[in-house]
Regions:
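Rossmann-like NAD(P)H-binding beta-loop-alpha module
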Residues: 36-117, 124
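A conserved regulatory-domain signal marking ACT and ACT-like small-molecule sensing domains
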Residues: 230-326
Length: 326
C-alpha cells in the first residue's frame, strides 16, 4: 500500500520524503530511479539513525572517499535494553518490559530485538556507502533475545560491553555484512554509546575514521530529518539530487569465511573441563566470574565462523557464544 502510494506520487511529479526504512530497504532503488525519470526527489534521511545526518553525509560530504567500512549501533530500543542490563544486572525480559513502559519498545518488539530493524538500516547505508545494491535479506541477522545477565557479568570481567552491531565491510568487488550482538572493548568508539542513542562509524580512504552520533529515534529527531529533506526538495525543484546507490551488485562473502574471536560460556568445573576446552580451542583465554558457579567462560583466538561452529559442536554444555569485535 505504501509502495503504491509513493509510486503514484512520484509518477505525478511530486517529491517524496520518508522515514520508513522497510520501504526504502525493499524498494528504494526502484523509487529513486522513478524519481530521476520524473525529475523529482525521493529522500529518506530519517530512515536511518533518526536525527543523525548520515545519509546526507554519505551522499555529499564523503563523495571524495571510497568507503570500505560502515558499522554502528542503529537501533535505540536494543541499545537501551543492553545498556540497562549492563548497568542494573537485570535479565532481558525485565528490561524489555521496562523499555515498553517507557515507550522505547513497541508492544510487539520483534523487529527491534531480533535485529530486523538494524538489518534494513545497514543495508540502506551499505548501498549508499558502496555505490551498489545491498539486499537486506542477504544479511545474516541475529537479535539480542539470547543475551543474559550472566553474559553481561563476563563482559564486565573482560573490560568490555555488549552491543547489537550492524557491520558492513567492502574489499574491492566483495563485501561482508552482519547484524549481531558483539563484545566491544573500551578502545572501540562505539563502546560508550549508551541508552537510546545511535552512532555510525565510517572509514574512508581519504577521511580515515569518523563517527556520527545522536538521537536515533523519537518524534523530534525524526521530524528534524524529514524537515531537512523537505527543504532539500524545495531547493531542487525540477532537478533530481543524485544518490550514490546503483543496481550494481557486489559479491557477498560467505559468512562462514568471516573471522573474529569468540567468547564462549560453558557448563562444568573449570579444572575438570579446561583440558578438553584447550584441546578443542587451543590458546584460549579463560574467564571466570566468582559469583557464577558451575560454569566458566573462555575467549578463542581469531577464527572463522565455520571453524568455530565445527569445534563448538564437539563440546558439551555450551551455554552461549558472542562474537568479539575490535
Amino acid at each position: 500500500m505504501l509502495f503504491r502510494s509513493t509510486k503514484r506520487a512520484l509518477e505525478a511529479g511530486k517529491s517524496v520524503c520518508t522515514s520508513n526504512k522497510e520501504l526504502v530497504a525493499e524498494h528504494g532503488l526502484e523509487l529513486m530511479e522513478l524519481a530521476k525519470k520524473k525529475k523529482v526527489n525521493y529522500m529518506f534521511e530519517a530512515s536511518c539513525g533518526g536525527g543523525i545526518p548520515i545519509i546526507r553525509a554519505l551522499n555529499s560530504s564523503l563523495t571524495a572517499d571510497e568507503i570500505d567500512r560502515i558499522s554502528g549501533i542503529l537501533n535505540g530500543t536494543t541499545n537501551f535494553i543492553l545498556t540497562e542490563m549492563a548497568e542494573s544486572g537485570a535479565d532481558f525480559d525485565a528490561v524489555l518490559k521496562q523499555a515498553q513502559e517507557l515507550g522505547y519498545a513497541e508492544r510487539n518488539p520483534e523487529a527491534d530485538v531480533e535485529g530486523y530493524d538494524a538489518c534494513r538500516k545497514i543495508a540502506i547505508l551499505s548501498s549508499l556507502a558502496f555505490g551498489a545494491h545491498v539486499k537486506y535479506r542477504d544479511i545474516y541477522t541475529e537479535g539480542i533475545t539470547k543475551i543474559t545477565a550472566e553474559d553481561m557479568k563476563y563482559a564486565k570481567e573482560l573490560g568490555m560491553t555488549i552491543k547489537l552491531l550492524a557491520d558492513s565491510k567492502r574489499d574491492g568487488e566483495r563485501f561482508s555484512a552482519m547484524v549481531c550482538p558483539v563484545m566491544l572493548g573500551k578502545d572501540s568508539p562505539l563502546y560508550s554509546v549508551n541508552g537510546v542513542f545511535n552512532a555510525v562509524f565510517v572509514h574512508g580512504n581519504v577521511l580515515g575514521d569518523a563517527m556520527f552520533y545522536g538521537s536515533g529515534a523519537g518524534k523530534l529527531p525524526t521530524a528534524s530529518a524529514v524537515a531537512g529533506d523537505m527543504v532539500d526538495c524545495a531547493k531542487h525543484l525540477g532537478k533530481t539530487v543524485m544518490m550514490n546507490w546503483s543496481n550494481r551488485e557486489l559479491e557477498q562473502v560467505d559468512r562462514k569465511e568471516v573471522t573474529h574471536p569468540f567468547f564462549v560460556r560453558i557448563q562444568g568445573n573449570r579444572e575438570e573441563r579446561l583440558p578438553e576446552v584447550l584441546e578443542t580451542f587451543a590458546n584460549s583465554k579463560v574467564v571466570t566470574v566468582p559469583e557464577l558457579t558451575g560454569e566458566f567462560g573462555f575467549v578463542t583466538e581469531c577464527i572463522s565462523e565455520a571453524e568455530f561452529e565445527e569445534k563448538a559442536a564437539k563440546l558439551e554444555g555450551v551455554l552461549g557464544r558472542i562474537r568479539i569485535r575490535a
